[in-house]
Amino acid sequence: MKQISLFLTVSVILILTSCRTRTTNNALKRGEKLKSSINSFEKNRKKLSSKVVSSLEEAKESLTAENPDLPEVSKDFEKQWRSIMKRYNKMKGDFEDIGTNSRKYFGELDELSSNIHNEKLRTEELAKNKALKGKWEKIYKEAEVSVNKVTTVLESGNDFHMVLVASSIRQKLEQNVTELTNIAEQAKALLSELEVFTQQGRQLVEG
């Protein structure tokens, strides 16, 4: 009877240890996934920012040249803008992944803290998790506003292409150049703002 009791006790300890180890591993994996999605977002943000600025500057230079070939400029711009939208969709997908992975990350973190036996310590750790989650959600929502603004700016780029095509028939340039400058400035500013989100996200997962 004593042997059975001892066996059951050891079995329970092993099961609990296994569960805790699995929870710890899951939390670590979630942290790595979140970090990876943040890094991917930053990579695509940088590439998008560079691509937007260079493409718009190139288009502006072509438009302000003497006797510009508008049909040719329009074709080149369309090609560049397709590449920009492709990169933007990657960045936006990464941003959505960050949201998903961060929710799972905090879920694993709470589960890990919930396994603390000492009630006072457990309560303190869960409170820390809650405070960190609140801070993160604020940062994420602010970044979401910027991402949506980037969407609006890039839609302006799509509209600009349509105007450019029409202008290639009408041969009107002055307004186009001004509009192009505005789009470039807005895109550059918004994409720079998102760098702050990346930095804060990295601080979250790296401690």
Language-model region placement:
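Extended amphipathic alpha-helical interaction segments
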Residues: 98-179, 190-199, 203
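Immediate post-signal-peptide N-terminus of mature secreted/exported proteins
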Residues: 20-86, 93
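Short, glycine/alanine-rich amphipathic alpha-helical segment
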Residues: 69-82, 126-138, 178-185
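Surface-exposed acidic loop/strand-edge motifs in secreted or periplasmic proteins
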Residues: 70-116, 120
